[in-house]
UniProtKB/Swiss-Prot annotation:
ATP binds at residues 122-129. One of its GO terms (biological process) is proteolysis involved in protein catabolic process. Residues 1-54 form the ClpX-type ZB domain. NCBIfam families: clpX, PRK05342.1. Zn(2+) binds at residues 13, 16, 35, 38. Belongs to the ClpX chaperone family. Keywords: ATP-binding, Chaperone, Metal-binding, Nucleotide-binding, Zinc. The gene is clpX. It comes from the Bacteria. One of its GO terms (cellular component) is HslUV protease complex. ATP-dependent specificity component of the Clp protease. It directs the protease to specific substrates. Can perform chaperone functions in the absence of ClpP. It comes from Mycobacterium leprae (strain TN). It holds the Pfam family zf-C4_ClpX. This is ATP-dependent Clp protease ATP-binding subunit ClpX.
Amino acid sequence: MARIGDSGDLLKCSFCGKSQTQVKKLIAGPGVYICDECIDLCNEIIEEELADADDVQLDELPKPVEIREFLEGYVIGQDTAKRTLAVAVYNHYKRIQAGEKGRDSKREPVELAKSNILMLGPTGCGKTYLAQTLAKMLNVPFAIADATALTEAGYVGEDVENILLKLIQAADYDVKRAETGIIYIDEVDKIARKSENPSITRDVSGEGVQQALLKILEGTQASVPPQGGRKHPHQEFIQIDTTNVLFIVAGAFAGLDKIIYERIGKRGLGFGAEVRSKAEIDTTDHFADVMPEDLIKFGLIPEFIGRLPVIASVINLDMESLVKILSEPKNALVKQYTWLFEMDGVELEFTNDALEAVADQAIHRGTGARGLRAIMEEVLLPVMYDIPSRDDVAKVVVTKETVQDNVLPTIVPRKPSRTERRDKSA
C-alpha cells in the first residue's frame, strides 16, 4: 500500500502522489489507491475521446439530395419545403464542423452565422413530421415545444429555458450532444402581438415571449434548471450553449395570406378578382410570396424575424397526396392497420375507392393528414372489436360504402382445414 512517512498513518494516491489529507476521497484497490481528482481527470479524458468518436465527419454528413430522398420515404408532397429544409440543415451542420476545423487550423476562420428556420402552413400538412424525420435521419437529439405554454420570466407559465431542458432530456443529459440538437417550436403564430404597433402594456404571452426567445435563438450560454420549473437561487443549473442548436419554429399563420395579397395587389372578391376553383385555392402556396413586412404586420417583432432567415412553406394536401399518405410511406396507416390485423391472423384490404373516400372526409373535416387516423379508427372499430374473438375470418375488405355510409366491411370467411372437415364428417 502506498503510504507517506515512517508512521504509516497517511495513505497517498498511487497516481498523483497526493496524501489523504490533500484530497476529498481516496478509494482503495488491491494494493493501490486513487483519489477523486484523478478519477475526475480520467472521466474527462474518456468523455473527450467519446465525443470525438461521436462527431459526424463532413464526408459522412448527408448531402441535400440525400436528405430530400430520405424525407421522400416518410413525407408525401411538400417538395419545396423538403428542398429548403435539406439545404438549411446541411449548411447548419457544415457550419458546426467548419467551426471545429477552424479551431484546429492556423488559418483564421470565417465566422458563419446560424440560419434558423420558420415554417408556415396549415395544420395537418406535415410541418412537425418533417422536423421529426430530419432529426431521425441525422441521429441528433430532438425536442418539441409549444409556444402557447410559454410566458415571460416572472409570470405564471413556462420559462423559455424549459425548452432547452426538453432537449437535454432527449440527449439523456449529455449537454455536449444536446448542443448540436434540433428544437421544434410549434404554434409560434399564437405568440404574435395583438397589434402591429409596439404595446404600451406588457404582453407576457405574446411579444414578451418573442423577446425572451431572442437570445437562445441567436446563441447564448443559458442556465437551465435541471428539474424544470422556475429558477431559484439555491439550485444548481445546467449550462448549455445554444449557438449550434438548430431552431425550427412553425405555425399555421391563419390570416397571413390576406396580408400578403393586400401587399401584392391580388384580390379574392369583387370585380377584378382572380377566378379559381376551390381545389386550386386549397392547394395554392399562399405563403410563397411572404416578406418580413408581412410577418411584422401579422404580429411578429422585427428582431424575432431577423433570427429566422430561412422560410419554408407547406401547402394544403389534395386528395391524391392524402391517398398516397395512407398507403405509400414506410409507416403508412394502411400498413400499420394491416399489421394489426395480421397479428390476429386476418388479412385486411382497402379498395382504391375506400382510400379516396377516407381522403375526401379528411379534406371536408379540414384536419389534413392528422385527421386520417381518426377516420380509419371510426371505420375499423366494429371489426377490430369482433375479430379477435372469432376464428372463422380470413379477410376483411373495406369499401367506399364502408367509409361513406357506415356499412360494415365485407368479411371473407376462412375455409375450414382438412382436419376440421374430417371432424365435421365424423
